[in-house]
Amino acid sequence: MTDSGEIDPQTAEEKVTDAQTAALSLSNLSTARRNEALTAIADTIERNVDRILEANAADVADAEKQVDAGEYTQAFVDRLTLSTSKIESIAEMVRSVAEQDDPLGETLTARELDDDLNLYKVTVPIGVIGTVFESRPDALVQISALSLKSGNAVILKGGSEAERSNRVLYNCILEATPEVPSGWAQLIEAREDVQTLLEMDDAVDLIMPRGSSSFVQYVQDNTSIPVLGHTEGVCHVYVDSEADLEMATAVAYDAKVQYPAVCNAVETLLVHESVAPSFLSQMMKQYRDAGVEIRGDERTQSIVDTESNISEEIIAATEADWTTEYGDRIVSIAVVDSLTDAIDHINMYGSKHTESILTQDDNRAEQFMRAVDAASVFHNASTRFADGFRFGLGAEVGISTGKIHARGPVGLDGLTTYKYHLEGDGQQVATYAGSDAKPFDHAEFDETWPVRNDDG
Amino acid sequence: MTDSGEIDPQTAEEKVTDAQTAALSLSNLSTARRNEALTAIADTIERNVDRILEANAADVADAEKQVDAGEYTQAFVDRLTLSTSKIESIAEMVRSVAEQDDPLGETLTARELDDDLNLYKVTVPIGVIGTVFESRPDALVQISALSLKSGNAVILKGGSEAERSNRVLYNCILEATPEVPSGWAQLIEAREDVQTLLEMDDAVDLIMPRGSSSFVQYVQDNTSIPVLGHTEGVCHVYVDSEADLEMATAVAYDAKVQYPAVCNAVETLLVHESVAPSFLSQMMKQYRDAGVEIRGDERTQSIVDTESNISEEIIAATEADWTTEYGDRIVSIAVVDSLTDAIDHINMYGSKHTESILTQDDNRAEQFMRAVDAASVFHNASTRFADGFRFGLGAEVGISTGKIHARGPVGLDGLTTYKYHLEGDGQQVATYAGSDAKPFDHAEFDETWPVRNDDG
């Protein structure tokens, strides 16, 4: 392979244009060829463990200095750090992508418009996908693997903190895929190259930013290319009057404590007033033991004050707390009068990510799930389940809080679009227009494109 | 009903905010209630034919003056003009929308993640849809009907030339829908209100502009809200070496002449060199008789020159011709050496709208259909079939040349998104994480949400 420190010296614009050219032939690479290429990527990564670890160690060493300087958190450096077992699991992830069903060439509908005039709606790749991500070097491999599986060309922009790790991984990917149309995966590194990418709306079909809310917002404000990303995860757990309080406590604990830094962790608990005294006294103890800071509205404060077995002083929640993604061991709590009030609170302050109701009453659960406007609405389950792997989508390219194209955890399906294939026999629209227009049949039937006749 | 000349004096911002509130309850209006409201709209429009015609006559009279002044074309005024039969067909269109299958509440997939932990992907409305359209007053009714059927609130901005017609139709719609959450349909009229709409990215989920390419481009460049629209229809017909030339001539004639002003009319013919002399001599005569102006590349010019039976002088096509949507009785023609050259020409100059190959060779057709990057790819059929009604989608809200969310003719499906519903039994993610993680089942099954247990 080429020296791990080298990448192609083309400009970002040339790279994007090459990706655009590659996308046209990539879309027609057979399932077998795409899967073979994925397997080769996994093998090449495993063969180059030492080289990857060496490059990563240099990135990590530099990042550690930034922790001392107060620039990075230790958690950030942890996400950056690779190990032999982590690299093995990256290779394993690539193999699992190879094993997934082909998302391409699926006939979604087949419809006879008239005799010998048949319309097929068939899944195809989107084209060129621009991605910007941070920290974890495994993101580069995951995004590349999902793009290849779904027949898309991809522009990869990783964080500067992972530059050496990303270069080695990128070169492993290129080395493993000589059979894939050259140019299908492009690494860009400079900050100003992101601007170039965002401006190339003729060449790039979709931008997927993964990073801070403000960065995603910046991308949305600075491109006319469609953006798939999530801006915030202000998720709620609502403990209903009909909740099983033991279950509610366990779920609210998991939703906050199991991994507080992620977007599907809960930020605000809403508690029905009828169960608030009893629920809060249980919940507070558990959160306190886990070191979770509580910010409560006035009713929460007063309930906790009057529950003699709780010694906490509850910090007063302000308006800002209801829209804050803490990403940390902090939770805000509000007591509500009714199911409707809980729904209204969520629709006003939530970020349309993931919302959960705890109740033993199925009708109340259904009302909540219908009325709350969010990508994922849960009944008696932790918000932390909102994840592509847990949802059974295989690997995920991200979670979307937008409502267009793909919503919630996005898997391979979100990287495809469709194309209409019409098979005719010389039909003209004039036949179906005017006063003696021939009517259409519009009958759906079971057939997949391409249709193969026995006589060839 | 209120006086047809009055509309609500709220600001555009208030209207959009009200639509946002309405959208939350609109999404839960039952199928029957939405269909009843659609039927009431059709009835109310029919009851108010005289009032609609009166308002329309005033719009048309003003527009006629602009024709004399050279501002509008007669075709523009024709599109603006309503008649009793046109109004009846508008009412009929609304009834046909009522009759279509409900696009909402459909369970797209059901997957067991684990015992008593079931995930349902269910179709839901998008939310608030902003639309900007021109000329035809029937567009206002069509867009409103499709939005209501799909549970979306809608902001309607029509052209000033149809202001009086649009006001009456809008008031008919409001009068007919007192049972629909108030605020679901909002009419805005001022040019500056469009800017307000484009800026309200927290409240508006999708913008659908219908109009000139430059207007759609303007919208894309001036909002961070997702845009569904089409910028150009530069469609091609490729006459292959294996084409049935009689069929090819008939299809190329229909694709250009049957309705040249629309986006799915052909703009460029590509002709394989082996059939060019024979095809062009037939085609030229037919186009000449229909008054179609021909712009040919050098090879087309020389072939036509040497074909003694053609008296035409062919205008030389310039580079600009290959990317021009004439929308008129003008066609450009290029002779190509091969199927691959035709594909390359289309992928370089086309607008990803609709492309058709004429050939009797199924393998060559398949190669073309796979390799051409367009929303609709046709084999032996006129490009003019690219249309929601002809495709059997029912009414269409527009044709998308983008690749994200909805592509080609967009029907009710394009106005929906989905929501993940997870039904659990108190599950925590901690159970499925770490070294002794419980594995997921991820088994798909047939069931629709909401699941009703017999015991309530």
UniProtKB/Swiss-Prot annotation, chains A, B:
Subcellular locations according to the entry: Cytoplasm
Entry keyword set: Amino-acid biosynthesis, Cytoplasm, NADP, Oxidoreductase, Proline biosynthesis
Gene Ontology biological process terms, A to Z: L-proline biosynthetic process
GO molecular function (one): NADP binding
Enzyme class: oxidoreductase
Keyword Calcium (UniProt): no
Record-listed E.C. numbers: 1.2.1.41
Recorded GO CC terms: cytoplasm
Pfam families on file: Aldedh (PF00171)
CDD domains according to UniProt: ALDH_F18-19_ProA-GPR
Catalyzed reactions per annotation: L-glutamate 5-semialdehyde + phosphate + NADP(+) = L-glutamyl 5-phosphate + NADPH + H(+)
Chief subcellular location: cytoplasm
Annotated signal peptide: none
Pathway: Amino-acid biosynthesis; L-proline biosynthesis; L-glutamate 5-semialdehyde from L-glutamate: step 2/2
Membrane-crossing segments per the record: none
Family: Belongs to the gamma-glutamyl phosphate reductase family.
UniProt function note: Catalyzes the NADPH-dependent reduction of L-glutamate 5-phosphate into L-glutamate 5-semialdehyde and phosphate. The product spontaneously undergoes cyclization to form 1-pyrroline-5-carboxylate.
NCBIfam families per UniProt: PRK00197.1 (NF001221), proA (TIGR00407)
Protein name, as recorded: Gamma-glutamyl phosphate reductase
Organism: Haloquadratum walsbyi (strain DSM 16790 / HBSQ001)
Lineage: Archaea, Methanobacteriati, Methanobacteriota, Stenosarchaea group, Halobacteria
Gene for this chain: proA
